[in-house]
Regions:
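Glycine-rich phosphate/adenosyl-contacting loop at the front of the ribokinase-like
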Residues: 1-61, 66-73, 77, 254-255
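Generic secondary-structure signature for well-ordered alpha-helical cores
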Residues: 14, 51, 80, 102, ...
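Ribokinase/PfkB-type carbohydrate-kinase core domain
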Residues: 1-12, 73-87, 100-248, 304-308, ...
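Short pre-catalytic strand/loop immediately N-terminal to key active-site residues, enriched for Gly-Thr
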Residues: 29-39, 206, 244-260, 280
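Short, glycine/acidic-enriched loop or turn micro-motifs at the edges of active sites
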Residues: 14, 18, 64, 167, ...
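Conserved post-catalytic alpha-helical subdomain immediately downstream of the catalytic base
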Residues: 51, 221, 248-319
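Short, glycine-/polar-rich solvent-exposed loops and beta-turns at beta-strand/coil boundaries
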Residues: 89-91
Length: 321
C-alpha cells in the first residue's frame, strides 16, 4: 500500500550558521550573527514537502545528543515520519559549519558524525514499499555511498527514484555515480555540479545524463544565465522535450542565505510531480519555493506553506496551482 508520497534518505545534520561581511581566504573578521538550524539535503527537501501537505518519512541516523533530538523534533513538528530515524546513543549527530557573507556566498565544512554509522540493517525494505518516491541525497563516507548504490539496484517495484548528487557525489565522477543515474526518474543538479561530474557544458551534460538512464534532468542555474533571450533560472529536459524556467526576483529584493535553495527547489518540483503537473509548472513551483527559502537564514526557515506557495503562484503566473 502506497501510504507515503516521498521517503527521503540522506545525511541528517545540524547546520551551524555564521554570517560575516565577506568570506576570507586568510585573515580575521567579526561575525554578524550566528544560529543553529536543522539541515541535511534530503531532509530539507522532505521537510519542505511535508509543509506543502505531502505524506513523508525519512531514513537516517542521528546521535543520542541534543542535536539529534533537535532534528527529530523538527521532523515531528513538520509531520515527517521518524520511525526509521535511528538514534545511535554513543555517536554525535552530524554537523555542518556554514559561513555565509552579505553577497550570498557560502563555505560549508561537514562533520559526518552519526551519519557514518548508517548500515543496511537500518533500512527496512517493507518501509520503502510504502513510498511513491524515494528521494536520495548525499553522504560523506564511502560506506554510505556504496550502500546507496546497492539500495537503488533493489528498489521495490513501483517506487520511483529522485536523486540530488550534490557537490560531494559530483566529485566522485561519472563512473561512480552511473549505477544510480541508471535508475533515476528525476535528477536534481546545479550547473556547477553538472560541469564537474560530466566535464561538459549545460546541454551536452544533460544529454549525457539522459544517455545514462535518467528520465528527467532538472538543472538549477543559481542566480541565472542567458538561454537564448531568456534569463533562465532552471533548465529541464524530459524525454525529447526541454523547458526553460524564467528567473523571478527574490521576495525580499535580495538573497539572505542561499543554503538549501536547491533542496527547496526539489521540494517544490516534487510537489508538482505528486499533483500531476507538467514539467514547466513543476519547475515554476520549484523556483518559487527556492525564492521563499532564500529569504531567510537557514535551509528550512523560509520554506513555504501550500497557502503561501499557491498565493504567489497565482499572483505571478495568473493561474491557480
Amino acid at each position: 500500500m502506497k501510504d507515503l508520497d516521498v521517503i527521503g534518505i540522506g545525511a541528517l545534520n545540524v547546520d551551524q550558521f555564521y554570517r560575516v561581511e565577506r568570506i576570507l581566504e586568510d585573515g580575521e573578521s567579526v561575525t554578524r550573527g550566528s544560529a543553529t538550524y536543522p539541515g541535511g539535503s534530503a531532509a530539507n527537501t522532505v521537510h519542505g514537502l511535508s509543509r506543502l501537505g505531502a505524506k513523508t518519512g525519512f531514513i537516517g541516523v542521528v546521535g543520542g545528543d541534543a542535536h539529534g533530538r533537535l532534528l527529530t523534533r523538527a521532523f515531528k513538528t513538520a509531520g515527517v515520519g521518524i520511525s526509521q530515524v535511528r538514534a545511535k546513543p554513543r555517536a554525535r549527530t552530524g554537523s555542518v559549519l556554514c559561513i555565509s557573507d552579505e553577497l550570498g556566498h557560502r563555505a560549508l565544512y561537514v562533520t559526518p558524525g552519526a551519519n557514518s554509522l548508517l548500515s543496511a540493517d537500518d533500512i527496512d525494505p517493507d518501509y520503502l514499499k510504502r513510498a511513491k518516491i524515494l528521494h536520495l541525497a548525499t553522504f560523506v563516507d564511502d560506506r554510505q555511498f556504496e550502500l546507496s548504490v546497492a539500495l537503488v539496484q533493489k528498489l521495490p517495484r513501483g517506487v520511483r527514484l529522485t536523486f540530488s548528487p550534490g557537490s560531494l557525489y559530483a566529485a566522485r565522477g561519472m563512473k561512480s555515480v552511473a549505477p544510480i543515474l541508471r535508475h533515476t526518474f528525476v535528477l536534481f543538479i546545479n550547473r556547477q555540479e553538472l560541469e564537474r561530474l560530466t566535464g561538459q557544458t549545460l546541454e551536452s551534460g544533460v544529454r549525457t545524463f539522459m544517455k545514462e538512464g535518467c528520465r528527467t534532468v532538472v538543472v538549477t542555474l543559481g542566480a541565472g544565465m542567458k538561454i537564448g533571450r531568456t534569463d533562465a533560472v532552471c533548465y529541464i529536459r524530459s524525454g525529447d522535450r526541454e523547458y526553460i524556467i524564467e528567473a523571478l526576483p527574490a521576495e525580499t529584493g535580495r538573497r539572505t542565505d542561499t543554503t538549501g535553495a536547491g533542496d527547496a527547489f526539489a521540494a517544490g518540483y516534487l510537489f508538482g510531480v505528486l499533483t500531476g503537473k507538467s514539467e514547466d509548472v513543476c519547475g515554476r513551483v520549484g523556483h518559487l519555493a527556492a525564492l521563499s527559502a532564500i529569504s531567510k537564514m537557514g535551509a528550512r526557515q523560509g520554506l513555504p506553506t501550500l497557502a503561501h506557495l499557491s498565493n504567489r503562484y497565482q499572483r505571478t503566473y495568473g493561474q491557480s496551482l
